[in-house]
Every structure is written in structure tokens, then in C-alpha cells.
């Protein structure tokens, strides 16, 4: 079985926390400095800035042990997309978001990513 520390860790993956900086909705832990760097890198494109700052690689959830299979990563990615969509809707009912999971078969295992950005 697991333990309480693992349960709390998984809760933060499947039901993440957010912060708002300059009207960007970002995963908790994001900084103003990182935001400014990504704004510069994206030429001020708000959608691209949010998308890159909010993306996660599903295969990076666990960094030790056996590499996950494509089926495992795609299953978790789909589930995380559903929970992320629900969390954003619950926490920001007045905003619209695009939540995207790269769910194509045959990708490199590290290319399965989940991200979100505000739809304007």
C-alpha cells in the first residue's frame, strides 16, 4: 500500500493548486521571474506563456523505477485532463480554459504532455 505522504503528493498532482499573477492563471509555485522570462521568450503571447508555464510531462510524475508504458501514460493523462478541467471550472467559474493533453498513439513517452491556458 501507500502512505499519507504519497497520498498528499498525488492529491497535488490530480487536484493542483493555482496562483494568479498579472491575470495569468498558473500552477502554484510559479514565480514572477519565470513569468517574465517566458513572456520574453514567447514575444508576449499570453496563450503561449500560460501553456508553457502550465505544462507537465506525464512521464515525469515518477522519476524513479521502470519507465511507464504508453498505455499507462495515456490513461493518466486523460484522467488528469478531466480532473484539471473540473478544478479550473470550480476555482475560476468566470474564466474559460483550454485544457490539452497530447493523446496521439506512438509518441515518445516524454512527449505526452498536459497543459492549459485561458481562452480569450
Locations of regions flagged by a protein language model:
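An N-terminal amphipathic alpha-helical segment
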Residues: 1-70
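Acidic, proline/glycine-rich low-complexity IDRs
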Residues: 65-120
Amino acid at each position: 500500500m501507500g502512505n499519507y505522504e504519497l497520498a498528499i503528493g498525488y492529491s497535488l498532482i490530480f487536484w493542483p493548486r493555482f496562483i494568479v499573477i498579472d491575470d495569468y492563471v498558473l500552477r502554484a509555485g510559479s514565480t514572477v521571474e519565470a513569468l517574465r522570462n517566458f513572456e520574453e521568450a514567447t514575444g508576449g503571447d499570453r496563450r503561449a506563456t500560460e501553456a508553457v508555464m502550465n505544462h507537465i510531462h506525464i512521464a515525469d510524475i515518477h522519476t524513479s523505477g521502470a519507465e511507464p508504458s504508453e498505455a499507462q501514460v495515456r490513461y493518466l493523462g486523460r484522467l488528469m485532463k478531466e480532473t484539471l478541467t473540473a478544478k479550473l471550472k470550480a476555482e475560476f467559474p468566470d474564466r474559460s480554459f483550454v485544457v490539452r493533453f497530447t493523446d496521439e498513439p506512438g509518441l515518445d513517452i516524454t512527449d505526452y504532455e498536459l497543459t492549459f491556458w485561458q481562452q480569450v
